[in-house]
C-alpha cells in the first residue's frame, strides 16, 4: 500500500478499535446481566447501547487529581503505556491478505512485545500512586506476567513451527485449504488462551486489581481520563489477544462465502464472548495457586507440546 493508503487505513483502524472497545464494554455488561439473570444497562439508548458513550463523557468531565506525594512522571505515563502499545500491536495484524498496516517478518513477536509492555504500565501506575494497595497490585502484576509470559511464547511456537514463519500472513496462509491449527495444536491453543487471559488481566487472572482485598489494585488512585485509559488498554488487550488467537489457531480471515475481514471480525467477537463468559463462570483463585499453576503445570505442558510439534515438523521435512 502507498503511504496515503496506509495513513487512511491506520486512521480508520484507530477509530474502529476505539469504537469496538466502547461497544465491548456495553456488550460485556449486557452479557453478564443475561448470565447472572439480571437486566444490565437498559436506560441510555435502545437496549442501553449508548451507555458506553455516557460513561466516556462522564470520565472525560471528571477531575483527574493525583494523590499527594505521587511521582507525577510515573503517574501520568502509566495510563498511556497501558493503551497505546495495544493500538500499536494491531499494526501487524492481518485482517485480510492485503489488509494490514505492516506485515512484519516478526509480527507474532511484535504483538507479544506489545502485550508484555502492559505490566510496565501497571507497575509504573502502582509506584507513581504511592499507595499500599496499588503497590501490592503492581507486585502481583509483575510476578503474574513473568510466570505467564514464559509459556505464552512457548504455546504459540507450535504454530510458528508448522507455518515456518513468524509473519501473520504466512501463518494464516498455512491454514488455508487445510486444517486450522486449533485442530493440530489443541494443547497449545488451550495454553495460549489461558496465558492470554493473564496477559489481558481478566478473571480468573485479575488478582492485581482484586476488589475484595486490594480495593482497585494499581488503579486505586486513578480517576477521570487516566482511569479511562487503563480500561481502554484492558479492552484493547482482550481484542488483541483474540485477534492473535484467531490468526494462530482459527485460520485468520479464512472462511466460506463471506469476505475475509468479516470472518476475522466474527472469530474475534466469538473469542471475546468466551472471555466474558469465563468472567461470569469462574471464581478467582488464590494468588499462590495461580503462580504455582503457571510454573508447575502450564510451563511443562507448553515445553512438551513444543517438543512433540518439533519432532513432527522434523519428520515432515525428512
Curated annotation (Swiss-Prot):
Record's keyword annotation contains Iron-sulfur: no
Record keywords, A-Z: Cell inner membrane, Cell membrane, Membrane, NAD, Quinone, Translocase, Transmembrane, Transmembrane helix, Ubiquinone
Cellular location(s): Cell inner membrane
GO cellular component labels: plasma membrane
Principal cellular location given in the protein's record: membrane
Catalytic activity: a quinone + NADH + 5 H(+)(in) = a quinol + NAD(+) + 4 H(+)(out)
Membrane topology (UniProt): Multi-pass membrane protein
Any Pfam family: NADHdh
EC number: 7.1.1.-
Functional description taken from the UniProt entry: NDH-1 shuttles electrons from NADH, via FMN and iron-sulfur (Fe-S) centers, to quinones in the respiratory chain. The immediate electron acceptor for the enzyme in this species is believed to be ubiquinone. Couples the redox reaction to proton translocation (for every two electrons transferred, four hydrogen ions are translocated across the cytoplasmic membrane), and thus conserves the redox energy in a proton gradient. This subunit may bind ubiquinone.
Subunit structure as annotated in this protein's UniProt entry: NDH-1 is composed of 14 different subunits. Subunits NuoA, H, J, K, L, M, N constitute the membrane sector of the complex.
Record protein name field: NADH-quinone oxidoreductase subunit H 2
Originating organism: Cereibacter sphaeroides (strain ATCC 17023 / DSM 158 / JCM 6121 / CCUG 31486 / LMG 2827 / NBRC 12203 / NCIMB 8253 / ATH 2.4.1.)
Amino acid at each position: 500500500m502507498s503511504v496515503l493508503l496506509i495513513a487512511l487505513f491506520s486512521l480508520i483502524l484507530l477509530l474502529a478499535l476505539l469504537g469496538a472497545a466502547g461497544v465491548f464494554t456495553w456488550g460485556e455488561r449486557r452479557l453478564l446481566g443475561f448470565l447472572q439473570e439480571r437486566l444490565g444497562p437498559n436506560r441510555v439508548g435502545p437496549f442501553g447501547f449508548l451507555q458506553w458513550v455516557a460513561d466516556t463523557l462522564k470520565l472525560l468531565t471528571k477531575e483527574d487529581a493525583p494523590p499527594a506525594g505521587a511521582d507525577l512522571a510515573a503517574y501520568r505515563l502509566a495510563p498511556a503505556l497501558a493503551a497505546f502499545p495495544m493500538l500499536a500491536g494491531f499494526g501487524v495484524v492481518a485482517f485480510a491478505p492485503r489488509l494490514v498496516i505492516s506485515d512484519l517478518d516478526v509480527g507474532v513477536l511484535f504483538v507479544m512485545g506489545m502485550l508484555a509492555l502492559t505490566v510496565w504500565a501497571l507497575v509504573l501506575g502502582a509506584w507513581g500512586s504511592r499507595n499500599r494497595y496499588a503497590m501490592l497490585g503492581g507486585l502481583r502484576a509483575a510476578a503474574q506476567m513473568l510466570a505467564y509470559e514464559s509459556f505464552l511464547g512457548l504455546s504459540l511456537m507450535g504454530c510458528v513451527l508448522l507455518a515456518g514463519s513468524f509473519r501473520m500472513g504466512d501463518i494464516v496462509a498455512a491454514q488455508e485449504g487445510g486444517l486450522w491449527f486449533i485442530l493440530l495444536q489443541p494443547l497449545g491453543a488451550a495454553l495460549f488462551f489461558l496465558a492470554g487471559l493473564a496477559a489481558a488481566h481478566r478473571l480468573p487472572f485479575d488478582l492485581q486489581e482484586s476488589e475484595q482485598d486490594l480495593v482497585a489494585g494499581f488503579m486505586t488512585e486513578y480517576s477521570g481520563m487516566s482511569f479511562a485509559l487503563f480500561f481502554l488498554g484492558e479492552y484493547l488487550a482482550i481484542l488483541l489477544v483474540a485477534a492473535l488467537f484467531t490468526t494462530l489457531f482459527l485460520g485468520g480471515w479464512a472462511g466460506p462465502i463471506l469476505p475475509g475481514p468479516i470472518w476475522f471480525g466474527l472469530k474475534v467477537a466469538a473469542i471475546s464472548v468466551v472471555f466474558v463468559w469465563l468472567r461470569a463462570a469462574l471464581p478467582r483463585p488464590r494468588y499462590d495457586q495461580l503462580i504455582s499453576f503457571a510454573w508447575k503445570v502450564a510451563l511443562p505442558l507448553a515445553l512438551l507440546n513444543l517438543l512433540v510439534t518439533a519432532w513432527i515438523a522434523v519428520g515432515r521435512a525428512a
